[in-house]
Each structure stands twice: as C-alpha cells, then as structure tokens.
Amino acid sequence: MKKIGFLFDLDGTLIDSTAAVMNSWITMANEAGIPLKALAGHHGIPAAQTIRNVIPDREEAEIQKWIRRVTDLEIADLDGVHAVPGALELLAELNDREIPWTIVTSCTTDLAIARTRAGKIPMPANSVTFDQVTRGKPFPEPFILGAERLGLPTSICWAIEDAPGGVTSAKDAGCTVAGVLTTHSREELPHADHHLEHLNQLLGKAGL
C-alpha cells in the first residue's frame, strides 16, 4: 500500500461551525469595541493570534481577557455544529484501511474536544491543537508536529484545509495540500496543490 498520512484541519474541513464562530466573534467584537471588518481574513488563524493582530496597541491583560472571552463563547455555542458532508464516511474508511490520520487545528484543546463531540467526529489522541504549539497557523509548526505524531515525514503527508492561512502553514511544512472548497473559493486558495468540491474526492486525488 502507498505510504501516506492525512492531516485534517477541523473547522470548515471536517465540521461546519460557521454560524457558531460568527456569533461568538460578533459578540466579542461588539463588547471589545473591535470593528467587524478588522476580523476579515482571519478564518483559520488561532483566536489568540487574531486578537493580537486586531488590537496590538492594547495592554496584555486586556488582550488575554478577550482571548478568554471569545474562547468561552465558542465553547458554549455549539448550536448547529455538525460534520461536513462525507467527513464521517471518509474517516471511517481511513480507519478501516489503517491509513494514518489526525487533526491539526487552530482550536484550543477544550474547544476542539467540544466541537468534535458536537459534530460526532472522532478526535485522535495525537491531534494537534493551538495550545500544543508555540506558533500556530499560518506558521508551519502545527503540520510539522502533526506529521511527527503520525511518525511520517511531511513529504508524504497530505494536509486538508479550507482557509488560506492553513494552506500556507501546510505548504511551508512540506505537505501536499488539498483545499476543500467549503468556506473559500478555488481562487482564494491558489497555493493548494489540489482542490476538493467534496471530501469524497480526496482518496482518488491521493491515488488511493
């Protein structure tokens, strides 16, 4: 069998959490006095990095306050969070065929656990979350760590991502990247090696 591993982003790739994410961030932004337009383009980037990007001039204690606030809001709001079509079937097939995979997410561990449970997505013990890396997406460390946890070089790992920051992270880590067109268009993910209209296309693209 072809030696390969799969590294899946979570939000927008395996689960649809769009409504919950938007509700949480709109609430936090209104409370913090952050213009909503300042948050544009940050999908897929860890909350802590996003908040530092949009309010860099505020005191550290206040930055930490809003990081905690939006994380708490996201953990509490799981309404409508569900698996992306084809996700459960794909992961079941990978398990049946003993093809290694894990999750590489910008969520904190607590948020990832909450969302995978809500979406009924299995969360492997070797998943990579934001609080396990020093620099999250768009930096390459999350996918490098994900490949290490699979015991594979990044050169034979496929990363499945829906956001530009995640694509950049995976490409810079040395992975082959499949951009799933759930939250962004093909034109918005120009650096992905492949594009997927549906997760059921992944194994064929990978030659499996």
Q: What label would you give each PLM region?
A:
Residues 100-102, 176:
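Proline-centered loop/turn at the N-terminus of a beta-strand
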Residues 16-17, 43, 103-104, 161, ...:
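Small/polar loops that bind or transfer phosphate-bearing groups
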